[in-house]
Every structure is written in structure tokens, then in C-alpha cells.
Amino acid sequence: GIIATSITSPALAASRSRIDSRVDTAMRELKSLGNRFSNLIDSSAGILMMPRIRRGGFGFGTSYGEGALLIGKAPVEYYSIASASFGLQFGIQRYSSAMFFTSERSLTRFRRQDGWTVGADLGYTLIDQGDVIDIDSNTYTDDVYGVIFGQEGLHIGISLEGSKYSRIVR
């Protein structure tokens, strides 16, 4: 409870330049995993990159992070991701996530909404890092793909489901 709240507090809000730097680092890390993500990176209408999401909890868990929506590899808007949950979970973890919008329609829908809850407002497919090698622009079946990478620490019960993305001003 208290530990999780202090770790994931929005008081840790970052400046625009710090977010840009963290997004660049996360993108390099994602690319360093091999060519498996090349097709998604190159052909996506937009990428919502959320580096350094902090998650913590003991029974009650919270998470918070800030990142940028990239269109044409340039940041165009800034977002936060936050969640709260109750259940079988414990630990502290830091990780990054990327949401790949594979169509202009899904990207436009995301940008027009005032907040977006994963799994409720738009369907997505969470892909395992090892599965990406089989995904290319000819086999996309969903408008949004998500990946979690760069995990540090241990947290039982990690998921993007129920996390809320909100536009922020930086």
C-alpha cells in the first residue's frame, strides 16, 4: 500500500525533455531485441511508448508512468498510464510498454478519446517478445498490439489490462 503509492506517485512527473530521452532509450532497447519488432515499428501508424512504468503492491497495487505518442518517429503528444488493482499480487517492478497502432483508424480513435482504458475502450493483443517474429503487415489481425519489455524487479500479476492512458501537457 504505502510503498506502492510512494513508488508510483504522479509526483514523479517528468519534464518533456526527460520523457523524450526515456522514450528514445526505450525505443533503442526494443530495437536491440533483434529484428523481431522491425515490421511493427516501421509500419505502425503510431507507437505509444511508455518507458519506466513503476508498479508496486502488496495486496493492493498501483502503477504509474509517462511516455509519448510517436508518429513518424517523432513525439506528438504525451501520456500517462496509471492503474490500481486489488488481489493476489506483491512486489516492486519497473518495465516499459509499447502500443503499436497498425491502422490510422485505431490511432485516430485513441487520440480522440479523453482517456483510454486498456481492454475496455479498444481491443489489443499483448504479444510475447518471442512471438513477434511471425507478425508482419500482411498478418495483422488487430488494430493495436502491445508489448511489455525491459522488466526489472519482481512483481507477480503484471498486466496492462485495466490501465488508463491519459493525455498530459508537458
Task: Give residue ranges: language-model regions.
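N-terminal export signals
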Residues: G1-S9
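Small-residue-enriched, tightly packed secondary-structure blocks
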Residues: A13-R170
